[in-house]
Amino acid sequence: GKISDHNQIETLYSHWTSEQIDAFWNKYFIKVLTIARPKDCATEVIKKLKEEGNNIVIITSRYEYAEGGTEIEDYTRKWLEKNGIVYDKLVLGAQDKLQVAKENNIDLFIDDSIKHCRNVQSGNIRTLLYTSICNQGVETPDLERAYSWVQIYDKYHKYFQK
């Protein structure tokens, strides 16, 4: 089948151990990263937000599989460049995204992980849960959802009156 979302493995194979999930990603991560495409309008919206003077910080929990390695960071940077996604800072290996968001003065945090959104929101940072295959059927009355990057852009301007 087609894996369209990085969290889909954990959702589809919830009976897997963390070791099995790590083994899967060790084997297939680069291939998945190579063929993945940005969500519709993501590139354009991020570019527009950057042009409006916003700092774009990409916070990901992706981590290097080998200590001292840079393979995941290199592929991530190449993917961002290939897809025209502009950013000021890339933070990899962020297991505590609230801490990273605070360290980088994040005004609006966007993620498709319910866990990460709840964590960041607990620190009083405005948060949007990007709806994806892995979270669309989950009730999240405590989180505000975004269904597209165009909607993210509109919500950002509503929140911050820019």
Language-model segments: residues:
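Metal-dependent phosphoesterase signature
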Residues: 1-44
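Substrate-recognition element of Asp-dependent hydrolases with the DxDx(T/V) motif
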Residues: 33-37, 42-76
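Anion (oxyanion) recognition and catalysis
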Residues: 50-51, 81, 121
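A structural signal for isolated positions on well-ordered beta-strands in alpha/beta enzyme cores
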Residues: 55-57, 89, 108, 126-128
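Substrate-recognition "cap/lid" segment bordering the active-site pocket of phosphatases
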Residues: 61-108, 114-118
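Structural recognition of alpha->loop->beta junctions
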Residues: 76-90, 139-162
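Acidic, Mg2+-coordinating phosphoryl-transfer loop and its flanking beta/alpha structural elements
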Residues: 109-147
